[in-house]
């Protein structure tokens, strides 16, 4: 009985977090502006909120992959896909050799590149999954939530770049990437493509979380940053 109550409490907490907008300040916010539309926030608090947001996106991406697997991907197919190697690739993100050589600027811009590379594909995923006959509401809702919150995360990171690097960044237009992902030859191939997309997004969501936590570690002047 206790475990059932705890599960209900945790589910309620997750629902509250899913509906609460953690980040997403207007892109025209300036340091000297006041009011509720452009709240004053310190760099540390902004980074903390962005990290919380990234953590939640990664958690929901894991839940989405699990739901999708249980609904559409037999265990034998999963094993074959796992043996097939890594089908994921994020464009324009170079691989650095040693952690000490990665600059804060590289971390920030690479994080933004990864985020922007997924805004279009996630919106396309919504289009294809709406065509499924028996897609559970939980999976559809999580997919829509990730798409929306990823755009909020993009806004938060652009504000962070402005604060840390004094650079202005344009927010991407997800509609520019919709055509490439929206059409698949048949349902089976579409399901496999969507599953690959979800698993690749999960990996990149974890990458974004790791980059942001490394950045936070450096801001705190800790000696344990090599763990990232």
Swiss-Prot record:
UniProt entry tagged with the keyword ATP-binding: no
SUPFAM superfamilies membership: 4-helical cytokines (SSF47266)
Cellular compartments annotated: Secreted
Disulfide pattern: 29-38, 88-200, 217-225
GO molecular function terms listed in the Swiss-Prot or TrEMBL record: growth hormone activity; growth hormone receptor binding
GO BP annotations, alphabetical order: animal organ development; growth hormone receptor signaling pathway; positive regulation of growth; positive regulation of receptor signaling pathway via JAK-STAT; response to nutrient levels
This protein's record includes keyword Signal: yes
Glycosylation sites: 141, 177
Main location: secreted
Keywords annotated in UniProt: Disulfide bond, Glycoprotein, Hormone, Secreted, Signal
Leader sequence segment: 1-24
Transmembrane segments: none
Matches recorded under Pfam families: Hormone_1
Gene Ontology CC entries for this record: extracellular space
Classification via Gene3D superfamilies: 1.20.1250.10
Assigned protein family: Belongs to the somatotropin/prolactin family.
Protein name: Somatolactin
Organism: Anguilla anguilla
